Amino acid sequence: MKVLWVALVITLLAGCQAEVEPEPEPEVQLGREWPRWQGSQPWEQALGRFWDYLRWVQTLSDQVQEELLSTQVIQELTVLMDETMKEVKAYREELEGQLGPIAQETQARVSKELQAAQARLASDMEDVRSRVAQYRSEVQALMGQTTDELRGRLASHLRKLRKRLLRDAEDLQKRLVVYRAGALEGSERSVSAIRERLGPLVEQGRVRAATVGTLASQTLRERAEAWHQKLRGRMEEMGTQARDHLEEMREQLEEVRAKVEEQGSQMRLQAEAFQARLKSWFEPLVEDMQRQWAGLVEKVQLAMATGPTSAPIENN
C-alpha cells in the first residue's frame, strides 16, 4: 500500500507541480466568453460562483463601474472568497480523515501538499480582490478624467489572474481527486488485509467457541440431571412427610370424634338421671295434691247432698 501511494504522489507531482512558463498575453477583449468552472463538490460549486462573478466583473460594464466605486464588488468578492475557502478547508479535513490507513509520513506529506495548494488558491483570489481594490482607488484619483487605460490594464490583470486561478484550482482539484481515490483504495486494501489477518483468528475463535459451547452444554446437562434427581428426591420426601401428616391428622380426628361421642353419652345419661330426679321430686307432691283435691271434691259433694233435706224441718 505504501508503494501505491508513492506511485500516486510521483504521478501527481509530475503532472501538477511543473511550473508553466507564462505565454505572451494577447490583446484583451472585454466581454470575451470564459470557460465555465464545473464541479460537484461543495468547494467546487463555491469556486464556480466566485468564477462567474469574476467573469462579470471583467466585463467592466457601467453597472460594474458603479459598484466598484461603492465597494460593493469588493465586498461580494470577499464573501465569495470566504465561502470558497471554508468549503475547501472542510473538504480537505474530510479527506485527511480518510487517510488513516496510510503510513504516517505519507499522510503528513499529503496534508502538507493539500495545504500548499489551498494556500495558492487563496492567494490567487486575494490577488483578484486586491487588484480590483487598487483599480477602484485609481479610478477615484482620476475622477473626471478618462479611465480607458485603467480599464484596459485591469482587464489584462484580471485575465492573468483568472488563468492563474484556473491553473491552481485545477491543480487542487486533481490532487483532491487522486488522494481521495488513493484513500478509498488504501482503505479497501487495509480492510482486506485486516480481514486476512483476522480470518484465521475468527475461525479459531469460532472453533474454540464451539468446543467451549459443547463442553458447557454437557456440563449444563449433567448439572440439570443432578438437579432433577435432587428435586425428585426432595419432592418424594415432601410427599412422604405430607402423607404422614395426613395420617396423624386422621388419627387425631378419630380421637376427637370418640371423645365427642363419649361426652355425648355422658351428657345423655346425666340428662336422664336429672329427669328421673325431677320426677322423684314432683311425683309425691302431685299425688298429695291429687288426694287433697279428691277429698275436697268429696266434701263438696256431701255438702250438696245434705242441704235440701234440712231446710223443710226448720220451717215447721
Curated annotation (Swiss-Prot):
sequence repeat locations:
79-100, 101-122, 123-144, 145-166, 167-188, 189-210, 211-232, 233-254
A single Gene Ontology CC annotation of this entry is:
very-low-density lipoprotein particle
Entry's SUPFAM superfamilies? Answer: Apolipoprotein A-I
A single GO molecular-function term is: low-density lipoprotein particle receptor binding
Q: Does the keyword Phosphoprotein apply?
A: yes
Q: Where in the cell is it found?
A: Secreted; Secreted, Extracellular space; Secreted, Extracellular space, Extracellular matrix; Extracellular vesicle
Q: How is it modified after translation?
A: APOE exists as multiple glycosylated and sialylated glycoforms within cells and in plasma. The extent of glycosylation and sialylation are tissue and context specific.
Q: Where is this region: Lipid-binding and lipoprotein association?
A: 209-289
Q: Where is this region: Homooligomerization?
A: 265-316
What S-S linkages are listed for this chain? Answer: none
- Coarsely, its chief localization is secreted
Q: Where does heparin bind?
A: L161, R162, K163, R164, H228, Q229, K230, L231, R232, G233, R234, M235
Region LDL and other lipoprotein receptors binding: start-end pairs: 157-167
Give the UniProt keywords, A-Z. Answer: Chylomicron, Endosome, Extracellular matrix, Glycoprotein, HDL, Heparin-binding, Lipid transport, Lipid-binding, Phosphoprotein, Repeat, Secreted, Signal, Transport, VLDL
Q: Which GO terms describe its biological process?
A: AMPA glutamate receptor clustering; amyloid precursor protein metabolic process; artery morphogenesis; cellular response to lipoprotein particle stimulus; cholesterol catabolic process; cholesterol efflux; cholesterol homeostasis; chylomicron remnant clearance
Q: Which InterPro entries match?
A: ApoA_E, Apolipoprotein_A1/A4/E
Note the Pfam families from the entry. Apolipoprotein (PF01442)
What segment(s) does the record annotate as region 8 X 22 AA approximate tandem repeats?
79-254
Q: Where is the signal peptide?
A: 1-18
The entry sums up its family as follows:
Belongs to the apolipoprotein A1/A4/E family.
Q: What does this protein do?
A: APOE is an apolipoprotein, a protein associating with lipid particles, that mainly functions in lipoprotein-mediated lipid transport between organs via the plasma and interstitial fluids. APOE is a core component of plasma lipoproteins and is involved in their production, conversion and clearance. Apolipoproteins are amphipathic molecules that interact both with lipids of the lipoprotein particle core and the aqueous environment of the plasma.
Protein's name in the database? Apolipoprotein E
Give the gene that encodes this protein: APOE
